């Protein structure tokens, strides 16, 4: 399986690509506007099955594309690769958080999620997830937390659930349709505020669910 990580030179994208690379099961392509920078990041992660390319070249032939760029660049990046992307599934991990007096919040709580807006500009299914995981946690090992995934396409969501489950020590849980991304992105703002207040890298755990 080939996974393209757009924004793979950033903190979260690089950490995610590194964790997938450590599993040794996937071909990882770091995508960036700057191919040389992407390749430098790939080399830093150990090379081998990790390579670097422009965003457009990274998505070609990939089985999953992770949109890990900053929130304010996500839609433009998605538009820029839409032609090369075709109907390949996209995993949206970004949240548009703004800070006012040190408190993080969504710019417009009543607006559609970034994941939903991404679905407007690409032909393939968009899945949202992994919002609550801190890059610092992925840098070290599988964090002791759960992660939530949502989307409307069953096959694409199952693929992301399988992959996400390999990144955390807890569980990757199906949180419903893509519309649930509004809640997931909002919850991320709360987690960011908690981590800033307590100087931590906390995640979430969902209790009371049956095993399996």
Positions of the model-derived regions?
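NAD(P)+-binding Rossmann beta1-loop-alpha1 motif at the extreme N-terminus of oxidoreductases
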Residues: 1-44
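Active-site-lining helix/loop region of Rossmann-like oxidoreductase modules
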Residues: 137, 145-212
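Hydrophobic Val/Ile/Leu positions in short beta-strands of Rossmann-like dinucleotide-binding domains
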Residues: 5-6, 67, 149
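Rossmann-fold NAD(P)-binding glycine/threonine-rich loop
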Residues: 94-134
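Short, structured coil segments at secondary-structure junctions
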Residues: 24, 45-48, 86, 122, ...
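General beta-strand structural signal in soluble alpha/beta enzymes
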Residues: 52, 126-130, 172-175
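Rossmann-like NAD(P)-binding element
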Residues: 49, 55-89, 98
């Amino acid at each position: 399986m080939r996974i393209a990580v757009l924004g793979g030179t950033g903190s979260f994208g690089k950490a995610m690509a590194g964790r997938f690379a450590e599993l040794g099961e996937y071909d990882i392509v770091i995508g960036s506007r700057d191919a040389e920078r992407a390749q430098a990041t790939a080399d830093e992660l150990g090379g081998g099955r990790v390579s670097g390319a422009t965003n457009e070249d990274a998505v070609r032939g990939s089985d999953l594309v992770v949109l890990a760029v900053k929130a304010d660049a996500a839609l433009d990046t998605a538009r820029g690769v839409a032609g090369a992307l075709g109907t390949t599934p996209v995993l949206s991990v970004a949240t548009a958080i703004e800070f006012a007096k040190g408190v993080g919040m969504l710019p417009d709580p009543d607006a559609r999620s970034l994941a939903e807006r991404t679905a407007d500009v690409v032909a393939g299914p968009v899945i949202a997830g992994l919002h609550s995981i801190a890059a610092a946690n992925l840098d070290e090992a599988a964090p002791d937390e759960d992660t939530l995934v949502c989307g409307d396409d069953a096959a694409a969501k199952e693929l992301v659930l399988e992959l996400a489950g390999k990144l955390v020590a807890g569980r990757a849980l199906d949180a419903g349709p893509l519309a649930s991304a509004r809640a997931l992105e909002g919850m991320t703002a709360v987690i960011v505020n908690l981590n800033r207040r307590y100087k931590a890298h906390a995640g979430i755990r969902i209790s009371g669910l049956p095993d399996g």
